[in-house]
Amino acid sequence: MLDKYSPAEIESKHYQNWESQGYFRPDMDLTKPSFSIQLPPPNVTGTLHMGHAFNQTIMDGLTRYYRMKGCNTAWIPGTDHAGIATQIVVERQLAAQNVSRHDLGREKFLEKVWEWKEVSGGTITQQMRRVGCSADWTREYFTMDGVRAETVTEVFVRLYEQGLIYRGKRLVNWDPVLGTAVSDLEVESMEEQGSMWHMRYPLADNPTEAVIVATTRPETLLGDAAVAVNPEDERYTHLIGKELILPLTGRTIPVIADEYVEKDFGTGCVKITPAHDFNDYEVGKRHDTRLINVFDLEAKVLANAEVFNFKGEAQPGFSLPEKYAGLDRFAARKQMVADLQEQGFLVEIKPHTLMTPKGDRTGSVIEPMLTSQWFVAMSATPNGSEPDNEFKGLSLADKAKKAVDSGAVRFIPENWVNTYNQWMNNIQDWCISRQLWWGHQIPAWYDEAGNVYVARNQAEAEKQAGKTGLTREEDVLDTWFSSALVPFSTLGWPSETDELKAFLPSNVLVTGYEIIFFWVARMIMMTTHFTGKVPFKAVYIHGIVRDHEGKKMSKSEGNVIDPVDLIDGIGLDKLLMKRTTGLRKPETAPKVEEATKKLFPEGIPSMGADALRFTMASYASLGRSVNFDFKRAEGYRNFCNKIWNATNFVLMNTENQDCGYGATAAEPRGHSFPDMWIIGRLNQTIEQVTQAYETYRFDLAAETLYSFVWNDYCDWYLELAKVQLQTGCASRQRATRHTLLRVLEAALRLLHPIIPFITEELWQTVAPMCDAKTADSIMLARFPETDGGEIVQTAFGQMTVLQDLIGAVRNLRGETGIQPNVKAPLFVESADDLADYLKYLPMMTRLTEARQVAALPESGDAPVAVCNGARLMLKVEIDKAAETARLSKEAEKLQKALDKLNAKLSKPGYTEKAPAHLVEKDKADLAELEDKMAKVQNQLAKLKD
C-alpha cells in the first residue's frame, strides 16, 4: 500500500535526486541523435509567473520525451542581466538609504549590483526547479558572466570591423526618468483622454491667411520644420512650397507635399517635427528638412535649439523663446497654450483619445529624442571575410529572411511567418546602446579629438591609436544584444567545440509572439552570420496566459496567479497581502482585494507541480491566448490523485501474487477480452501521444492521456478487472494481474514528460513488479512503443457490446429513478449468447443478478430497453406515488432555474454586451437544463402510462 498522495513530499525528494545524480546532463555521445533546446533567459530580477510556467512545461516536456527516446539531450538554462530592470532594483534599494548611484560612482555602484545578483538573483532558477525543469544546471549561464562578456566583445568588434556597427545620431525612444534609450518592447501604449489643439499657422506673404494645424503635442511646436499636406488635396495645392510663420517664434517653415498626410483626417495639415516624432522623422528625411531638437535629456526645453541634417551633421542653431527655456515639457505645454490663446493662434481645443507611450519600468512618457547612439546596420552587406556558407555576403536582415524562406527555420503555427516577414520587410537599424551603468560596456575608446577606436581591450585600442590616455565609451549594450548570441555563446564559440557540433542548431525554440522580432529574429541574424548555421530548426509560438475571463494578468487588476502559490497553496490573508503590496497604483488595492476574495474565498489550496504542469500542457494549443481557469487545475489535481489510487488498487491485487513476470515466468495465457481491449487501447494511445509530442501538441497529448487513464483504464478496465479477479479461473486472474501492471507501467512512462514527479514515485514501485525497471529513473527509461501486434478488433467489438449493455442498464436505472443503493435483477432476452458479457453487469451496474432468458417475464410496470437486438428488463417494484412526487419536485426546481436563465438571456442587450465566453456558458447551461427537464418529463410520462 502507498501512503496518502503528498505532492510536496515526493517533489522535493525526487528533484534533488535527479539533479545530484546528473540525470539532466547530456552524455556527449556524438553517435546518438541529439535534442537540444534553449531557455529564453528570464530576467535575473524576476520571479516565476504563469507565462514561465507555461513555456517551461512545454520545454521540459519535450526534453524529457526526447531523453526517453534515447537522444543526447541538452536544455541549457540561464538568466538575463536585464540592464534596466536590475539597475532600477538596486537604485531603489540605495534610494531607501538616501544614496544615489552618482554618489557611489560607477565602479562602486556596479559592485553593489553584483552583490545583489549573488544574493537575490537566483530566485527564478530555484522556482524553475520547483516546476520540475530538467535543465542541465551545470551549464547554467548569466548573460554578463566572463564567458558571455568575451563573446559579446568579440561579436561587437567583428561587426564593427565588417562595417555593420556604427555610431550615429538617430531618433530613439527616450525615457527621461531613466536617462536612457529604451526598446519598443519596454514601451507600453496607454489609452488616455487628452486634447487636440487646433492652431493657426499664418502665411508669411499674407499673414491674414492661415492654415489650421491640429496636434496633441503643442510643446513640440518649437521644433517644427515644415507643415505637410497631401499632394492631391486641392484645398492646399496652391500653398505647396510657400512659407508659413511658426507661432510664438517668428520663424518661417515651408509647406511640403507628402502622401503620409491623410487629407480626410483632421484639417489635412500636419505639423512636421522630425526630431520629436518617428513618423515626422521619415517625412523629414524624404524632404531633407532640418532636425530641430528642442529638449534636453531630462525633457526640458533648451535655451538654444540643436539643429542637424539627416547625416547627423551639426547645423547652425538658434535661440528658443527665453520664457520656455528650462521648463519641463508639460509645464512648457501649459505656458505655450496660454500664449497661443493670448496671441490669437489658438483656434479651438477638442477632447481626444490618444495612445500615450510610457516606459514600462518608470511610467514616464517616452520622448522621441535625437541622440548619438550605436547601431547595428540591418541592410548593409558586410565588409571583409566571412565564413564560407550559404549566407555569405548577405546583410543581417537578408540572412534572417533567407533562413525562414528556405525552410531552415520553420514557425509553428505557420501563420507567424507572416508576422516575422512583415517585421523583417520594414526593418530599421538596431539601436544597441543604452545610457546605463549595468550592462556590457561598449568596447570603444576615444581620444581627445573624438576619434573612436573599437577593440577587444584598452591595450589593443591604444595600439590602434598609437597613444595612451584614451577614454572608454560609457554607454552599455542593449540587453537584447547579448541575448541574441546565446545559441552559440553557450556552446563554446568562437572555438569549434563538440557542443557546437552536437547542439547547434537546437531543435526548437519555445517562446511567446511578443518577442519574435526583438529576440527570435536577432538570434537568427547573429547565429547565421557568425556560424553559418541557423540557431534552431523550429520556433514554437505559444499564446499569452490570461485570467479565466480572458483579461491580461496584471497586479493592478488583482488577477495575477503565482505558479508557486498553486504548487504550495497559500492562505487568503497572505494572498491578499501579496496582491496588494507594491501596487503601481495603491488606490486600486480595494478592487484587488475584492477580486481576490471572489475568486479564492479560502485562499489557494495546494495543487502540486504535476497538477500545474498538466493544466499548462492541456492549454498548449496553437491559439494566441490561454485563459487560465483555476478549476481546471483542481480537476487535474484530482487526476493525479486518481492515478495514485489506481496504482494502490493494482498493488493491492498484484503484490506477492503470480503476475506472469520473472525470469522463469511464461507469457500469461487466457487473456479476457477486456485484457485484450485495454492492451489495444494502450497501443493506440502510445501512437497518438507520440504523434502529439512530436508535433508539439501537448494539449492533444494531455487530452489523450487523461481519457485513456481516467476513462479507459480506471473507470472501465479496473472495474472489469475486479470481476475477473473475483470470478475468473487462475489462468484468467494471472493474465489480468499481468495486464494491470503492464498497462499501468507503460501509462506512467507515457505521462512522465508532463507529470514527472508522481510518475517517478509510482514507477519505482510498479516497474520492478513487471520486469520494466530498465533504468535507475523513469526519466532514463525508454518511452513506450507499440508492441507491433495488431489491434484485436474482436476484443474491441466485444468491449463495445459490453459498454452498450452497461450503458443501457444505467439508462434504465436513471430513467426510472432507481436509487443507487437499490439493487434489482436484470433479465435479458437475446438470440445471441451473452454469457461472456452478463457476468460483468451485476458489479458494474449494481444488480442482484443478470440472467439471459428465452422471453422476458410478464410485468407491466418493469422498464424495458433495447440494445444491439437484445431486450433488457429491470425487475423492480416502484412506488409510483412516491416517485411521481419526487420527480415533480425535481421538475419544479429545474423550471425555476430555466426561467431564471431564460430571463437573463432575453434581457435587452445582454448577449451583445456581455463577454462572449459568459454568454456561451449561459447558453450551454440552458441546453443542459433543458435536457434534464426532458428526461424528468419523460419519466413522469412513463409513470402515468
Model-derived regions: residue spans:
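Feature 926 captures the class I aminoacyl-tRNA synthetase adenylation module centered on the KMSKS loop
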Residues: H198, D388, Q422-F481, L485, ...
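N-terminal, positively charged nucleic-acid-binding surface of large information/translation enzymes
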Residues: M1-E232, I256, T273-R286, R290-F308, ...
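Secondary-structure transition/capping motifs at alpha-helix termini
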Residues: R64-N72, Q93-R106, Q126, R130-A135, ...
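Short hydrophobic beta-strand segments
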Residues: S34-P40, G46, K271-I272, D447-A449, ...
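Conserved hydrophobic residue
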Residues: F24, I165, L346, V409, ...
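Structured ligand/cofactor/substrate-binding pocket environments in proteins
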Residues: A53-T63, G70, T79-D80, R148-T151, ...
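Short, contiguous pre-domain boundary segments
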Residues: M1-S6, K401-E414, T596
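Active-site-adjacent bridging/hinge elements
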Residues: T31-L39, G61, Q97-S100, T125-G132, ...
